[in-house]
Design a protein with these regions (language model features):
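Positively charged n-region of N-terminal signal peptides that target proteins for export
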Residues: 1-4, 18
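Sec-dependent N-terminal signal peptides
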Residues: 3-12
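N-terminal leader/targeting segments and the immediate start of mature chains
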Residues: 11-54, 67, 202-211
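A short, amphipathic edge element
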Residues: 23-24, 114-126
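Short, exposed beta-strand/loop patches in secreted or surface proteins that constitute
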Residues: 32, 60-63, 77-78, 123-130
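Short, solvent-exposed helix-to-loop capping segments enriched in aromatics
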Residues: 33, 105-120
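An acidic-aromatic
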Residues: 59-108, 178-179
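Gly/Pro-enriched, hydrophobic low-complexity segments
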Residues: 125-128, 132-207
Length: 211
């Protein structure tokens, strides 16, 4: 989970100076994601820094239904019923409870993570390319407030055929490269509301921390 937190929670500000072709592709992608009543997603992530010798990988999955979501990253889990959000951290056996709308711009809701480009960036259409034998659009994102964030570029790979997000790469100022790859996406996936119910009894020995 820490990899994705590092990759996504540092995004902020408002967009300007957009590339028309890139913007049209991203607008279509946002509309597709927001048009889903529910969806299921699986992904992999990697953080690499040659200077420090860092090379860490994690996998995750998430279910989204309206404003509710359940997401797991490595050994950690986030559950939100749209009102409250619980982050279960197994390393220190703690559960952190917050209001679902608190720090909304830093939400780990998969739907919001998959539309994070909607604000905070200039964008530029780079080229068409191939990714795993599939034609993709390559779009660069550049933060408006570059001096306030730890990265300088995010590269998006969007399927030319389906207009789905396939991969995102973040390049940090210290040489760290973070990669997020979508491995499965199921539209309007069947998911019961019980998936988004948190029960402290299922986590004996854990400490509940309320903000």
């Amino acid at each position: 989970m820490r990899i994705l937190l590092t990759l996504f929670l540092i995004l902020s500000a408002s967009a300007y100076g957009q590339d028309a072709k890139a913007q049209a592709i991203l607008d279509k992608l946002s509309a597709k994601i927001k048009g889903q009543k529910s969806f299921y997603v699986e992904f992999s992530s990697n953080i690499k820094n040659n200077a420090s010798g860092t090379n860490q990988s994690e996998t995750g999955k998430g279910w989204v239904k309206g404003e509710k979501y359940y997401a797991s990253f490595g050994e950690n889990t986030i559950i939100s019923n749209g009102i409250k959000t619980w982050t279960i951290v197994r390393d220190d056996k703690s559960v952190y409870e917050t209001d679902a709308n608190e720090n909304d711009g830093e939400s780990m809701n998969p739907k919001k993570l998959m539309t994070v480009w909607e604000s905070g960036f200039k964008n530029k259409y780079e080229k068409e390319d191939q990714l795993n034998n599939e034609a993709v659009h390559v779009i660069d994102l550049f933060p408006k407030n570059a001096g306030k964030v730890q990265y300088h570029t995010i590269i998006l790979y969007v399927s030319k055929g389906t207009n789905d997000l396939k991969k995102a790469i973040m390049k940090a100022k210290d040489g760290t490269i973070m990669t997020y790859a979508l491995t499965k996406f199921t539209s309007n996936a069947a998911v019961e509301d019980t998936k988004f119910v948190f029960d402290m009894k299922k986590f004996p020995g854990y400490t509940l921390v309320k903000d």
